[in-house]
């Protein structure tokens, strides 16, 4: 399919497609400007597939382990673990399609057709939105739990079934957010008639490109992160103002561990994703020359966001005693 306007490359998180090895290449970098590369970047050709393969192997193994532990261990069927399960599913789905991205880098063209192109880009954006929104829901849950503990109140509405309904709502909401990217995704041919997978925007393509970046930045980062910050700021204010009763302290000890786990997972997520979204701000406000340094930094930032999909299982293993115990019991079976 010939793309309308200037398509954005497959690596839609903000990286630029690898230049063809060996000669001068002029290609669209996803910003609406053609970038000419006078020198190849052979180290990226070798390094990127190795990094992505490591993320894929570790992420797929780790997230599969998380899913199995939560589904098979009765003691792991808690409200918080419902959200962790869905987070693992989202990360696992992304690692499943990462080999396609690796193949595209190695082949230097897109051989898989338009349907798979749309699916890969959709899953990529599912990962962008679902990660932060499930963490936002987990933060809301922690806020309500700690607030109820402070006030020594029970929460009859906080049930395993309710967590499933909330997770379904997140998936439906994320699906709505991802639909525009699925619609604009397609296979196009660049100036060298090499098929590529990317986001194809109509005229004026520069306006559409900036709109897509603002859309992802605001709905995929600013809005949920601001919500999370407001919740935890209010929670800290309340905890300082209210002295816990003795009964609340007893209740809070076990829940404090879960709150710490959620906070650490959230912190790692922000560490991995903030550079990507800051890079989006740079892409929106400046016109950087596509030098080897800029291209390399772009891939580092993108790889960092990819890495978030394989880090969470290690956090659960280090911070959750129940997860470690149940994981060992499954290995013995």
Swiss-Prot record:
What molecular function terms (GO) are annotated for this protein? Answer: G protein-coupled opioid receptor activity; G protein-coupled receptor activity; neuropeptide binding; neuropeptide receptor activity
Q: How is this protein annotated for GO cellular component? A: membrane; neuron projection; plasma membrane
Which keywords fit this entry according to its UniProt record?
Cell membrane, Disulfide bond, G-protein coupled receptor, Glycoprotein, Lipoprotein, Membrane, Palmitate, Receptor, Transducer, Transmembrane, Transmembrane helix
- Classification via InterPro entries: GPCR_Rhodpsn, GPCR_Rhodpsn_7TM, Neuropept_B/W_rcpt
Where, in residue ranges, is this chain on the Extracellular side?
A: 1-45, 106-120, 186-211, 283-292
Q: List the disulfide bonds.
A: 117-197
- Reading the lineage from the top rank, the first entry is Eukaryota
Regarding the membrane, this protein is recorded as: Multi-pass membrane protein
Q: In which tissues is it expressed?
A: Detected at high levels in caudate nucleus, hippocampus and amygdala; at moderate levels in the adult brain, thalamus, parietal cortex, pituitary gland, adrenal gland and lymph nodes.
Where is it located? Answer: Cell membrane
Q: What is its main location?
A: membrane
Glycosylation positions in this chain: 24, 29, 34
SUPFAM superfamilies linked: Family A G protein-coupled receptor-like (SSF81321)
Instruction: Please describe what this protein does.
Output: Interacts specifically with a number of opioid ligands. Receptor for neuropeptides B and W, which may be involved in neuroendocrine system regulation, food intake and the organization of other signals.
Family in the record:
Belongs to the G-protein coupled receptor 1 family.
Name of protein? Neuropeptides B/W receptor type 2
Organism from which the protein derives: Homo sapiens
């Amino acid at each position: 399919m010939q793309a309308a306007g200037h398509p954005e490359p497959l690596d839609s998180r903000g990286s630029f497609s690898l230049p063809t090895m060996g000669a001068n290449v002029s290609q669209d970098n996803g910003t609406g400007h053609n970038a000419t590369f006078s020198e190849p970047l052979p180290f990226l050709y070798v390094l990127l597939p190795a990094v992505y393969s490591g993320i894929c192997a570790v992420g797929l193994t780790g997230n599969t382990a998380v899913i199995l532990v939560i589904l098979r261990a009765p003691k792991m069927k808690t409200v918080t673990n419902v959200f962790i399960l869905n987070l693992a599913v989202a990360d696992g789905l992304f690692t499943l399609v990462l080999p396609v991205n690796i193949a595209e880098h190695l082949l230097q063209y897109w051989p898989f057709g338009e349907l798979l192109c749309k699916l890969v880009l959709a899953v990529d954006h599912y990962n962008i939105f679902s990660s932060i929104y499930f963490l936002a829901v987990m933060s809301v849950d922690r806020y309500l739990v700690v607030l109820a503990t402070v006030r020594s109140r029970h929460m009859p509405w906080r049930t395993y079934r309710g967590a499933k309904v909330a997770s379904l709502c997140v998936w439906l909401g994320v699906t709505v957010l991802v639909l525009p990217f699925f619609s604009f995704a397609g296979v196009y041919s660049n100036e060298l008639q090499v098929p590529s997978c990317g986001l194809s925007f109509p005229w004026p393509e520069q306006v559409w490109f900036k709109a897509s970046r603002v859309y992802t930045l605001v709905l995929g980062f600013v809005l949920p992160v601001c919500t999370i910050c407001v919740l935890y700021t209010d929670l800290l204010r309340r905890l300082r103002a209210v002295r816990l009763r003795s009964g609340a302290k007893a209740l809070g000890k076990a829940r404090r561990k879960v709150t710490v786990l959620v906070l650490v997972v959230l912190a790692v997520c922000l560490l991995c994703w903030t550079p990507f979204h800051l890079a989006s701000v740079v892409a929106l406000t400046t016109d950087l020359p596509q030098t080897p340094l800029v291209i390399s930094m772009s891939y580092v930032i993108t790889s960092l966001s990819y890495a978030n999909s394989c880090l969470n299982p290690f956090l659960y293993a280090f911070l959750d005693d129940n997860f470690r115990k149940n994981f060992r019991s499954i290995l013995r079976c």
